[in-house]
Protein backbone atom coordinates (compact mmCIF):
# COMPACT_ATOMS: atom_id res chain seq x y z
CA UNK A 1 0.00 0.00 0.00
CA UNK A 2 1.23 3.53 -0.67
CA UNK A 3 1.72 5.91 2.22
CA UNK A 4 -1.46 7.55 3.46
CA UNK A 5 -0.22 9.48 6.49
CA UNK A 6 2.99 11.22 7.47
CA UNK A 7 3.75 11.12 11.20
CA UNK A 8 6.27 13.75 12.29
CA UNK A 9 7.70 13.12 15.77
CA UNK A 10 9.26 16.02 17.69
CA UNK A 11 10.47 16.76 21.16
CA UNK A 12 9.04 19.49 23.37
CA UNK A 13 10.27 20.94 26.63
CA UNK A 14 8.69 19.63 29.82
CA UNK A 15 7.39 23.08 30.79
CA UNK A 16 4.70 22.81 28.09
CA UNK A 17 2.88 20.39 30.40
CA UNK A 18 1.49 17.30 28.65
CA UNK A 19 3.42 14.10 28.09
CA UNK A 20 2.42 14.10 24.41
CA UNK A 21 0.85 16.71 22.13
CA UNK A 22 -0.86 15.65 18.91
CA UNK A 23 -0.87 18.40 16.28
CA UNK A 24 -3.52 17.83 13.62
CA UNK A 25 -2.32 20.50 11.17
CA UNK A 26 -4.18 23.05 9.05
CA UNK A 27 -6.45 20.58 7.21
CA UNK A 28 -7.19 17.59 9.45
CA UNK A 29 -9.52 14.98 8.04
CA UNK A 30 -10.95 11.59 8.91
CA UNK A 31 -7.56 9.83 9.08
CA UNK A 32 -6.14 12.40 11.49
CA UNK A 33 -9.27 12.11 13.66
CA UNK A 34 -8.99 8.32 13.68
CA UNK A 35 -5.28 8.48 14.57
CA UNK A 36 -5.92 10.96 17.39
CA UNK A 37 -8.69 8.78 18.84
CA UNK A 38 -6.46 5.70 18.72
CA UNK A 39 -3.43 7.48 20.18
CA UNK A 40 -5.41 9.03 23.04
CA UNK A 41 -6.79 5.61 23.95
CA UNK A 42 -3.55 3.68 23.49
CA UNK A 43 -1.43 6.24 25.37
CA UNK A 44 -3.50 6.15 28.56
CA UNK A 45 -2.61 6.92 31.34
CA UNK A 46 -0.23 9.51 29.83
CA UNK A 47 -1.43 13.11 29.50
CA UNK A 48 -2.17 13.56 25.78
CA UNK A 49 -3.10 17.03 24.52
CA UNK A 50 -4.46 17.79 21.06
CA UNK A 51 -3.45 20.95 19.16
CA UNK A 52 -2.21 22.74 22.27
CA UNK A 53 0.49 23.85 22.77
CA UNK A 54 1.41 22.73 19.22
CA UNK A 55 -1.14 22.37 16.42
CA UNK A 56 1.22 21.75 13.46
CA UNK A 57 -0.65 24.30 11.34
CA UNK A 58 2.21 26.68 10.39
CA UNK A 59 3.21 26.38 6.74
CA UNK A 60 6.73 25.21 7.61
CA UNK A 61 5.63 22.03 9.43
CA UNK A 62 5.93 18.60 7.84
CA UNK A 63 2.28 17.99 8.75
CA UNK A 64 1.19 21.12 6.86
CA UNK A 65 3.29 20.13 3.84
CA UNK A 66 1.77 16.63 3.81
CA UNK A 67 -1.80 17.93 4.06
CA UNK A 68 -1.61 20.94 1.78
CA UNK A 69 0.87 19.88 -0.89
CA UNK A 70 1.24 16.09 -0.91
CA UNK A 71 -2.39 15.02 -0.60
CA UNK A 72 -1.59 12.96 2.49
CA UNK A 73 -2.90 12.93 6.01
CA UNK A 74 -0.43 14.34 8.52
CA UNK A 75 0.02 14.25 12.26
CA UNK A 76 2.69 15.82 14.47
CA UNK A 77 3.52 14.13 17.75
CA UNK A 78 5.40 16.15 20.36
CA UNK A 79 7.03 14.10 23.12
CA UNK A 80 7.95 15.73 26.44
CA UNK A 81 11.67 15.76 27.27
CA UNK A 82 11.09 13.66 30.39
CA UNK A 83 10.12 10.73 28.14
CA UNK A 84 12.92 11.01 25.57
CA UNK A 85 16.14 9.97 27.26
CA UNK A 86 17.46 6.93 25.39
CA UNK A 87 19.58 5.85 28.35
CA UNK A 88 16.97 6.35 31.09
CA UNK A 89 14.92 3.31 32.03
CA UNK A 90 12.31 5.65 33.50
CA UNK A 91 11.49 6.84 29.97
CA UNK A 92 10.94 3.31 28.68
CA UNK A 93 7.19 3.11 29.45
CA UNK A 94 6.42 6.15 27.28
CA UNK A 95 8.63 4.95 24.43
CA UNK A 96 7.01 1.53 24.56
CA UNK A 97 3.50 3.01 24.73
CA UNK A 98 4.11 5.30 21.75
CA UNK A 99 5.60 2.47 19.70
CA UNK A 100 2.63 0.21 20.45
CA UNK A 101 0.13 3.01 19.79
CA UNK A 102 1.68 3.80 16.41
CA UNK A 103 1.51 0.11 15.49
CA UNK A 104 -2.25 0.17 16.18
CA UNK A 105 -2.61 3.34 14.08
CA UNK A 106 -0.68 1.69 11.24
CA UNK A 107 -2.84 -1.45 11.35
CA UNK A 108 -6.11 0.47 11.37
CA UNK A 109 -5.02 2.80 8.56
CA UNK A 110 -4.11 -0.25 6.47
CA UNK A 111 -7.50 -1.81 7.21
CA UNK A 112 -9.22 1.45 6.24
CA UNK A 113 -7.44 1.49 2.86
Where are these regions (language model features)?
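Short, hydrophobic alpha-helical segments
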Residues: 102-112
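Catalytic cores of processing enzymes, dominated by hydrolases/peptidases
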Residues: 1-95, 99, 103
